[in-house]
């Protein structure tokens, strides 16, 4: 059950939506950068990229440690993709245009 809770439950590392403001109340989220650092340490990671919580565009949260990349492309009207190349971050739009938006 610990494995399930860690990876598959509503509050798991994979499905947790409490990082995003519109879900703060339903998840009773009160996260800090320190909380995010603990999760990243557990995962031995620098960032978490989430693709299941639709935003208007790619968003970065908690000092660029969390990326929300589901920008509504599934609706066929808008959308962006995240491309990471040579440690640089780009937004790709439906027209194929790449825009650098963050440097590491």
Give the ranges of each region predicted by the language model.
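Feature recognizes metal-dependent phosphohydrolase scaffolds
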Residues: 1-104
